[in-house]
Each structure stands twice: as C-alpha cells, then as structure tokens.
Amino acid sequence: MVFVLLLMMVMVCGWVSVTELVEGDSSRKIVEIICRTSLLKSESSCVRIERVFKVHNTQRTLARFEEYREAVKLKASKLAKKHPRCLADGNELLRFHGATLACALGSAGASSLCASDKCAVCRIIRHGFSSSSSSNSSSKKDGKAGVGVFTTSTSGRAFESADEAADQQDDPAARRALLVCRVIAGRVHKPLENVREFVGQAGFDSLAGKVGPYANIEELYLLNPRALLPCFVVICKP
C-alpha cells in the first residue's frame, strides 16, 4: 500500500527539480514511514531525518525508465523459464541508495540543485546514476566495485554506505543523504563469493550482494543505471 502511494506521489515536469516536503505534509509522512519500516532492529537509531525533498523527474527521464522496463519484460518473455514478476512489471522494487551532499540543499531553506560533480546527490538527480555510483568501500571490500549501482532494502544500510562514501572523499563538511528509488530489478542473480564468476553471464539484470534470513535481498547491484528512478531525497541529521 505504501509503495502504491509513493507511485501516486511521483510527479513529472519539463525540467528536473526538487520540492521540500515540510513536517506534517502527508507525502513526507509516507516517506518517513518507508524509511522507518525498512529499518532492521540493529539500525533503529542510525537514521535521523532532517529534510525530505520530492524529485520532479523530466518526461525524458521517466520515458527512459519505462523503456528499460519494457526491454526487461521483453527479454524475460524469451526465456525458457518464465519469471512472473519480470513479465508483469520488470520486477520493480523500492530501494535506497546512500550518497553524499556537498552543497547547501536543505540548508536555510535552499531548494535548488547545484551543478558540482562533487555533490553526488545533485549529480544523480540531474544526470542519472552511473556504475561508479556503487564505488563505496563496502563494494570494494567484497570485490563488487564497478559491478553496478549499489542499493539496499533498508535505510540504515544505505546511510552506512553514504558514511563510507564520505570517508572516501575525506570531506568533513559533506552531509549524508538517502535517495529513495524505484528500481527495475529484472532477473536477479544469486550472491557470488567471486564476482568474476558473474562476468559474461547473460540474461541477468541485477546481482544480489546480500540476502537476509527470510530470502529478502538486502543489498542489490543494478547492472544498468537506467534501472533506477530517484523519487525522494532524505537528508539525514549528522
């Protein structure tokens, strides 16, 4: 139900922009619920929300996202083993991506996106994701750097990845943010100890990095950046 409400809240306009959702706003409450209900018990106190912004994606961005969905569905229809979710909607999921914020967005009422390449949040919203979006220390440690865009099922893990990215940048002023995204997961490959085994395997659209105790995919690498559509920016308190 929460996911359906999120889809209804995503607006499309002629240029990319963001609008702050103030405290008490019904849309903000839904985003807060999404962040809170996704937390694991061990993460219960690590994410404190300071600001929430709604992303207004361009028609072109949304069209690219839908075109990718159709490509995934078409590819799935040609497989001998059918995957119902892939055939239905491309296996769409709601995921979090942690990123650093190097500009004044959210400070003193600022709501404009910056043009700096050093600001991961604004760069992603303006230009979309890239495979380098997965290059945090976690993906490097497990050998998956450069495999795809790193996403998580919990806001707490995404916040940790934003922390890792900030440590890499060595910028004490960088703030942490979460991007709440719709993603087309498509056909998901099970986790691999050696990611080199994955190279050259056709027919998969994403790679599971970590699977939880109930077979839920806690960490997921999207192989194609077009598979992600950022919907909300959640700026976290330090």
Question: Which residues are covered by each model-predicted region?
Answer:
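Intrinsically disordered, low-complexity terminal and linker regions
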Residues: 1-114, 233-238
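Active-site and NAD+-binding cores of ADP-ribose-processing enzymes
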Residues: 1-2, 12-16, 20, 171-238
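Eukaryotic beta-rich interaction modules
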Residues: 72-78, 115-130, 156
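A conserved ligand/cofactor-binding region detector
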Residues: 90-93, 97-99, 104, 127-138, ...
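Core residues of folded domains in eukaryotic genome-function proteins
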Residues: 90-94, 120, 145-149, 175-179, ...
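Extended catalytic/binding region for NAD+/ADP-ribose chemistry, centered on the ART fold
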Residues: 96-97, 124-126, 130-165, 181
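Short coil/turn segments at secondary-structure boundaries
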Residues: 107-111, 162-165, 192-196
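Short proline/glycine-enriched turn/loop segments at secondary-structure junctions
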Residues: 165-171
